[in-house]
Amino acid sequence: LSPTSGDNGNWDLFDVLKKIQSVLDSGDYKFANLSIGPHLPIGDDEVHVWTAVLDQICAKHGILLTVAVGNDGNEDGDAARIQPPSDMVNALAIGAADRSGEKWGRAPYSCIGPGRSPGFVKPDGVIFGGSDDEPFYTYNPLLGSIVGVQGTSYASPLALRTAAGVAALSGTPLNTIALKALLVHHAETSRKYSREHIGWGRFSEDPNVLIDCPNDTATVIYYGSLAKNKYLRAPIPFPDVPFDEAFELTATLCIQTPVDPEHSVNYTRAGMQVTFRPRFGLDDTDTDDFFGQKSQYKTERECRSEGHKWETCLHRSKKFSADTLLSDPVFDIRYHARDSSRHVKGVSAPDMQYAMVISVRVKDFDLYNVIRQRYTILNPIQLRTQISLDT
């Protein structure tokens, strides 16, 4: 910001956007946080220039961008809605939780969703941002001391810190979309708060949580690029030995996509269609829409037919009873593209960067080692050697 930012009615801060654009468009940065933007709620019929410009840059350079959703959550009606550019489809919109420990909730000031469709689930999640009962402590260089503050502006970089921490810990090169998918995949849900308030849930502050597997859980990560009209078959890690417990399947799929700012309804130019085949190992042709419309949208809210197929982030956990038969289950993922709502030929569509995280959990069952023995092709994430220095 400069002393003249916002003068002469320039409340959209276009001069600030140009400076941010010039830095990020250099391609030198893979991680960035924005705790700044126009002070107004998003609208459904028009994409703000901040959102459109930054979405294109993130897709072009593969940047993991976290954006604070704003601090007007106490306002009435649409005035409490998230603020641009946190409605980006290629970034993580971060709200604030009121506590860092248990019994947490949405901080009252944290702006709420929903976003547009596509980009309906906003905020993407929340993380500790401070409250009257538990301030967020940070260093104030002007005072030269630690002060207690609160706001989504502090929550947003904390979420980015977790993702960057995973990249620093991992000797396995994970792309930024995989880091985003891991954050969403391990978000802690709450029955007390709706998705419009906390998104997918509370993000972890500990990067180790995102890459550690408990004994009763097996998690695999698929990531890379996918050509249009091609498909990826992602095997789900499932034991071939009998067990008598209920189990839970959790999956998260994230992509980065070019956007079409002139068409808010058809804003994303790419999408993924996911088909769940629960008994692929038995040559069973039955399929299931695991990431169905109801997994993304509230049933009482109208949404476009098959709109979830154009979302950039899909996430769901589903519990199965002990007598459910699964045999070598897989997800089939197909990439499709459009331009101004029109179909795009395969030769003109760019390759799509994607990441999918899949977890299976069976309580009181040594699932991790069973999966390691069955799928010898799987490689655990290698961790960098850490050296502790005594002070």
Where are these regions (language model features)?
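Subtilisin-like serine protease catalytic core
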Residues: 1-12, 60-62, 88-90, 114-122, ...
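Subtilisin-like peptidase catalytic core
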Residues: 1-46
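Extracellular S/T/G-rich loop segment that most often corresponds to the catalytic His/Ser-adjacent loop
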Residues: 82-164
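Short glycine/serine- and small hydrophobic-enriched flexible loop segments
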Residues: 160-171, 185
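C-terminal subdomain of the subtilisin-like protease fold in secreted/lumenal serine endopeptidases
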Residues: 171-248
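Extended, solvent-exposed segments with strong compositional bias
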Residues: 219-223, 281-328, 337-342
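Extended low-complexity, serine/threonine- and proline-enriched intrinsically disordered segments
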Residues: 248-307
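C-terminal edge strands of extracellular/lumenal beta-sandwich accessory domains
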Residues: 267-281, 324-391
